[in-house]
Structure formats: C-alpha cells, structure tokens
Amino acid sequence: CPEEHQILFWLAIHQEPVSILELKPDLISVITQHHLSDYLESLYLRMLLEKIENQHYFTMQPVLMEYVTQKLIITVTQELITGEFNLFNSHALMVATTKDDIRNSQIRKIINPIINSLLEQFKTQQNLEIHLKSILLQTKQKYPLASGYFKENLINILRHLPTNLKSDNFSDLTIGQANLQGINLNNVDFSNYHFKNTIFTQSLWVWAVAFPPVMQQCERPRSLISNCRSCNILL
C-alpha cells in the first residue's frame, strides 16, 4: 500500500536501524503516524524488514535498501524536472541532525546522485540553479504555509551543488533538516524565518528567541540555541 511504500523510503533515507519513536516524527501524515506499528509489522511479516536489538529497531536488507534508494533518486529527480511534487515534499532527503557519518552517507548516496541526474537534464550548474531557485520562489509565494520537506530539500540540494546563496531571500520560511554548514550566508535574508533541526558552521547572533510553555520543564540552558531541544529560534 502507499503508506508502506512511504515507510520504506524513510528507512532508506535513514540508512541505519530506527525505532518507531524515531520514525514517527518524520511522517507528515497523521494517519500514517497512528498506524505506523501496524505497517511496520506487516512489512516485517512479508520479510521486507528486519528487526534488531530486541525487536525495537527496524531496517531493510542491503539489497532492498539499495533498490529503494535508487527508486527514491529516480522519482525525486523526475518530480524536480516536471514540477509535480509528491515524494520530494513528503520525505527529507537528508536528516541534518543525524550522526556525521550517516549524514555524509545521505549526501553521497542520495543528494549527489540526484544532482548528477538533474545536471544531465539541465546541462549546466547555472541552468539547474536558476530552475531550483525559481521553484523555491514560486512555492514561497503560492504555498507559504505548506507543510512538508519541500523547502529544506531544495535548500539542501542548492547547498551541495555547490552554489552561492549570498543575498538570496529565504524570508518567511519554516525550514527543518537543512544543512547550512560551510556556506557563506552573508546578506542572506532570513527575516521571519523559522529554524528547526538546522545545523550551521558556527553560532548565530540571536535577536529574538521564542520559548514554548514546555521551556519551564527544561534544564536551564547554557546556550539559548543548543541546549533546549523544544526551543524554536525566530529571526
């Protein structure tokens, strides 16, 4: 079923065994979240998944993992070419806050192959950059409050072209799972930008910080940015 396919794609993206608690927040569909354990059990009974570490973690066999990853690359590439987005919005192509070796593997096995496939279509990096930035602008104007991973996926692909983001306008966006390490962000417009699970080269100057009610339950942070996971930063 489509929901099981979505779960297989997520397991391919994580590239390591994950628990239900780790997998559930990734899903944008509330219905899929609610029935996640049932879908995982169904996949396991059909021998499409493996359980490890006392049955609490799920993954795929290497051959299936490679097949699903290739399917992900082909599907996302086609969506970016045609402008009809489904998988590109429902799944984060890279988990910015995961371990360094996993994140590097996601870049090598998912992000870079997508970029290479797109370059075959658009011929030059400049043409591809123009196409991707136009998609980001159109989406921001038409669907400013849309949920999903569309915007962070675009930023992660632009970041690994590599391209120059100086003076670009990313205002009024909500972005999670973006890797901005090693990028020159001088004069980039991040006004009214909601950062979530995003990593940077170095600390930011913070002009305004919004603390949710659960902040009172957190240990008093040494740093406003890094030590309270439930705190969101609004610039």
Predicted regions mapped to residue ranges:
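Core register positions within helices of long alpha-helical scaffolds
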Residues: Y39, S117, L154-H160, Y193
